Swiss-Prot record:
Name recorded for this polypeptide: 4-diphosphocytidyl-2-C-methyl-D-erythritol kinase
HAMAP family: IspE
A Pfam family of this chain: GHMP_kinases_C
An example Gene Ontology biological process: isopentenyl diphosphate biosynthetic process, methylerythritol 4-phosphate pathway
A Gene Ontology molecular function term of the record: ATP binding
Organism, as annotated: Anaeromyxobacter sp. (strain K)
Pathway this chain belongs to: Isoprenoid biosynthesis; isopentenyl diphosphate biosynthesis via DXP pathway; isopentenyl diphosphate from 1-deoxy-D-xylulose 5-phosphate: step 3/6
E.C. designation(s): 2.7.1.148
Family stated for the protein in its record: Belongs to the GHMP kinase family. IspE subfamily.
UniProt-annotated stretches for the region Disordered: 289-313
Keyword Ubl conjugation in record: no
Gene responsible for this protein: ispE
Role summary: Catalyzes the phosphorylation of the position 2 hydroxy group of 4-diphosphocytidyl-2C-methyl-D-erythritol.
Lineage start: Bacteria, Pseudomonadati, Myxococcota, Myxococcia, Myxococcales
Amino acid sequence: MRLVTLAPAKVNLVLRVGPVRADGYHDLRTLMVPLDLGDRVDVRVSARPGPVRCTVPGRPELDGPENLAARAAEAFRRRFGVDRAVSIRIEKRTPVTAGLGGGSSDAAAVLRCLARALRVRDGAALAALALEIGSDVPFFLGPGPAWAAGRGERLSRAEVPPLDLVLVYPADPSLAIRAGDAYRWLDEARASGSQAPRRLGRPGRWRPTLLGNDLQAPCVARKPALQALLGLLVGAGATAAIMSGSGPTVFGIFPGRGAARGAALAIQGRAKGGAAGVQVLLARTVRRHPRVSPWRSPRSASSRSTRRSSRPT
């Protein structure tokens, strides 16, 4: 069986970080929303035994068993006693290590495809498996925008209206941020007294005044260029701009699709004029994760379109 789906990117509209726990993780309260931007994940499940293979065309450094999507497939096979060969192909559109959840979303997409192909309906077991793979993976198995608590495993549905965004990803390697570093910098800032701990609060109805990210200040302190990118977004008309997750991607919220498109073009023009090494992406939040669909060849898709267009109206 061959299945395809979109693995959506996400942004954190709210990210509040509690103190470090005994297990080394932090308690979180975060509002995550999926985007209409993401990777295309193609999963083939053979009827015969065999290995897991994962390829990312154009990104050979992401091929192989260390890709989180491949690790998700291996974990699924172990958990549910499956030995069938699995082939994964990812068309990468979400920037890597960007605070947009690309790898976690790919992993969740693989779990959803395998669950459908092999008729696994144990949602609790899938959710537990997702958390073993990564803290953000359970969110991408969920229904859509959600408040996440704990490590990210306690999810509650959130109502978020469609938001038009411009994302700016600094491709300069010197601005890359590892998630572990971002949390460590926050712990150090709090220990020194330069950043006071926040109360996590309770999930509530989304409103723009909630927008915020506890990791932003310590990351900007170490990577001042991020502040300039936030300034680009505000200067282009964003009503607000923050860093997503552990960064380094920043995003701005705009009053409509037209305003966002104009801002993206303006920021791209600035990038060509000197702010080199940035990727500018236009996106909109969505209210549910994409469905898993059977794979169809481009030829069969075009023939269906031709048949539809030839019908009398």
